[in-house]
Amino acid sequence: MAERVQSHTPGPNKLPARYLQFQKRYPKVFQAYDALGAATAEAGPLTDKTRALVKLAIAMGGEMEGAVHSHTRRALEAGCSPEEIYHVALLGTTTLGFPTTMKIFSWMDDVLAQKE
């Protein structure tokens, strides 16, 4: 069984300003969103690391830069290594295409370079 999820949202010092503004402006919506994230995480057998990598892959497929940044940070927090994170991007090459994969690597580097 998967580990129990404490919160869907990372610490406040890691959140983008836009996210914090949304949280402040729409607290009830934010609470519902946070609860939905926790409920979906707890609904199945995936581990924290596996969930983090799956969510990263979903963000990659949507070509969402902010989400790739966020889920790269979350993958690190879940205990994933940079090599595991880069492997997810590499696996997307044949599905997303080489130019998209290069773009995703640059987004991951935005986060991973700060950790070095």
Q: Predicted regions span which residues?
A:
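Short alpha-helical scaffolding segments that buttress acidic/His motifs in well-ordered protein cores
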Residues: 33, 37, 53-60, 88-93
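Acidic, glycine/proline-rich low-complexity segments that act as flexible tails and inter-domain linkers
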Residues: 1-50, 103-116
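Short connector loops at helix/strand junctions that flank enzyme active sites
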Residues: 49-53, 70
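Residues at alpha-helix boundaries and short interhelical turns
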Residues: 23, 40, 44, 61-65, ...
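Mid-chain, well-packed structural core segment of small domains
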Residues: 60-89
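Short polybasic/polar patches that bind polyanions
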Residues: 42, 76, 94
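C-terminal structural segments of small proteins and small subunits
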Residues: 86-109
